[in-house]
Design a protein with these regions (language model features):
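VWA/integrin I-like adhesion module and closely mimicked acidic/polar interface patches used
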Residues: 45, 202-211
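Well-ordered, non-membrane alpha-helical segments in soluble/globular domains
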Residues: 84-92, 172-178, 211
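Von Willebrand factor
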Residues: 64-190, 194-195
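DG-centered beta-turn motif at the end of beta-strands
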Residues: 74-75, 179, 192-206
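Surface-exposed acidic, glycine-flexible loop patches that form ligand/cofactor-binding
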Residues: 60-63, 95-98, 182-189
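Acidic, polar low-complexity linker/tail segments
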Residues: 13-84, 96
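N-terminal intrinsically disordered, acidic low-complexity segments at the extreme N-terminus
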Residues: 1-15
């Protein structure tokens, strides 16, 4: 004879175990979801906490940069195709070797350097899509900003300078001295400074000439 009471008790026991297992799994799932939300929240909070104030015109941190590269291109001379290609490659290395929030300023040698000594372009690298935080930024938009706000403005200036006809006077020594003061004087003490000069370094000014 089948013990129906025993069968009934066994079935109820199984149902209870299934119920307990479901409750455990549900609890673990809730804990896992809460853990993910907490982790994401931590990333977002940390990113917002460490976010720097950025100047919209230059893309540079308002409290200063850690590295400032100044490029001086001598337009008093004409460059042949081979020279242009070499200079373009060097400029590309400088630009693409510039890290996020580091600054590049471009100057040219001119006869009227003492009247106005402003960079033709001065931009900080806003960072490309490779360093995007997916919780805070859009990868495609970040890449477009990097190209439109950093790469294209600099390339446009470089092209204009290298394609220009020679301007005659080349006060290169005065320009190097003036730029060393004008470009770097407002930087933080801790800012690394570097000056790149593209010139034949032949002085040709009203004061002195090596021709």
């Amino acid at each position: 004879m089948i013990n129906r009471k025993h069968q009934k008790g066994t079935m109820e026991s199984r149902r209870n175990r299934r119920k307990q297992n479901k409750e455990k799994k549900g609890g673990l799932l809730i804990f896992f979801i809460i853990g993910i939300i907490g982790t994401i929240g931590g990333f977002v909070f940390n990113a917002m906490l460490n976010k720097q104030d950025i100047d919209e015109a230059t893309n540079c941190p308002t409290d200063g940069v850690n590295y400032h590269k100044v490029i001086l291109i001598d337009t008093s001379q004409s460059y042949n195709p081979i020279q242009k290609e070499w200079i373009k490659n060097q400029l590309k290395k400088i630009v693409y070797g510039t890290k996020e929030n580091e600054k590049i300023s471009v100057y040219t040698v001119g006869a009227n350097y003492h009247e106005t000594l402003l960079p033709l372009q001065s931009k900080c690298n806003p960072g490309d899509a490779s360093g995007v935080n997916p919780f805070l930024e859009n990868k495609r938009m970040k890449q477009e900003d990097w190209e439109n706000e950093f790469i294209k403005p600099l390339n446009s200036v470089f092209k204009g300078l290298l394609d220009n006809d020679s301007e005659g006077l080349s006060p290169i020594m005065e320009m190097v001295q003036a730029i060393s003061i004008a470009a770097f004087q407002n930087e933080k003490t801790s800012t690394k400074r570097e000056l790149f000069i593209f010139s034949d370094m032949i002085q040709n000014s009203e004061v002195a000439s090596h021709y």
